[in-house]
């Protein structure tokens, strides 16, 4: 969102973390810990607010300070009623969780999409006016799951559209098998971490290993498990540039992490709990870092459109800026 706003200098941009818009959600946050692994609650809420403050961005939590001409979302699973008459654009921010039996039940019963307990319905509610997707594969995914195909525009997504830049780095290690973990336990999902570590060790087959922990993980627990089940000398990082680590690895093992797309874009051999061939179809387009600018162009055009919201897309022609990018040769 910050990158997109940098191309909207002629507009007065304000930012808000995701916020609860119903009594039910507010009660969940106040009386339970179910939202602790999300930006709805701390510590992630504070972390995102600190980012906004550090970069001098204007904050309007819950969007009450101004009347807005356009609202740009990165989730359509929680959209406040007060914005439903406003022009809205949804921007994909990363990987979408697998659909589960619960996803289907929530969808069929018309329950709020967050009842799925994951992001499997993000991008599939058809609430927003325009949907900016990472790739043609994701466009097809969202269309198949309920969003009007006419609303879907393949723009690429900031942070995942120029992965070759990470090949130029000063990370001191190379040619290791990298394991990027997911915060499943911190978000109340089941995980057998010892079994995952053992599987990664088997894949590495004696090669140097490097674990990069998810930022939300309990570091002490995760490190203790790695020390117990991985070979001596295994490298473990909780902080640092994940993309640089991926750029220098020989093979990447993930669970449900979006960073698998960095590995795919760089032609690495990757492992995931998702089907890898399907991930290659979904992988974000590489346009040399033009996604934020292209999304901002759509924002400008939509804000300046004086007709009815539903008439915009029928007269709009998307002309993306593209930087030539070499075709990826997969390992």
Regions found by a protein language model. Name each.
Residues 126-131, 208, 248-251:
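Short active-site oxyanion
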Residues 1-162, 260:
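Active-site and donor-binding regions of nucleotide-sugar-utilizing enzymes
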Residues 3-8, 154-226:
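Conserved catalytic-core segment of nucleotide-activated headgroup transferases in glycan assembly
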Residues 24-26, 98-106, 162-167, 245-247, ...:
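Short, charged, surface-exposed secondary-structure boundary motifs
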């Amino acid at each position: 969102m910050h990158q997109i706003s940098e191309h909207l200098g002629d507009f007065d941009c304000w930012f808000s973390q995701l916020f609860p818009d119903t009594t039910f959600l507010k009660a969940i946050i106040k009386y339970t810990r179910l939202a602790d692994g999300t930006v709805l609650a701390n510590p992630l809420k504070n972390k995102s607010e600190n980012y906004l403050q550090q970069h001098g961005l204007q904050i309007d939590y819950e969007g009450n300070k101004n009347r807005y001409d356009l609202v740009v979302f990165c989730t359509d699973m929680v959209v406040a009623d007060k914005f439903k008459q406003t022009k809205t654009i949804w921007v994909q921010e990363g990987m979408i969780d697998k659909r589960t039996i619960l996803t289907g039940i929530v969808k069929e019963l018309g329950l709020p999409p967050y009842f799925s307990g994951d992001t499997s319905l993000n991008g599939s509610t058809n609430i927003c006016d325009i949907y900016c997707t990472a790739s043609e594969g994701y466009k097809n995914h969202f269309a198949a799951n309920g969003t009007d195909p006419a609303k879907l525009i393949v723009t690429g997504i900031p942070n995942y559209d120029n992965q070759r830049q990470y090949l130029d780095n000063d990370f001191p290690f190379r040619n290791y098998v990298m394991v990027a973990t997911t915060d499943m336990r911190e978000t109340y999902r089941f995980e057998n971490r010892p079994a995952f570590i053992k599987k990664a060790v088997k894949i590495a087959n004696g090669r140097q290993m490097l674990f990069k922990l998810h930022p939300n993980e309990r570091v002490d627990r995760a490190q203790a498990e790695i020390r117990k089940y991985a070979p001596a000398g295994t490298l473990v990082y909780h902080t640092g540039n994940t993309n640089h680590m991926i750029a220098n690895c020989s093979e990447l093992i993930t669970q449900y992490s979006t960073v698998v797309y960095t590995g795919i874009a760089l032609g690495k051999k990757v492992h995931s709990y998702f089907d890898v061939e399907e991930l290659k179809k979904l992988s974000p387009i590489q346009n040399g870092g033009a996604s934020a600018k292209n999304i901002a162009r759509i924002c400008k055009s939509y804000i300046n459109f004086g007709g009815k919201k539903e008439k915009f897309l029928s007269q709009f022609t998307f002309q993306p800026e593209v930087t030539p990018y070499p075709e990826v040769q997969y390992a």
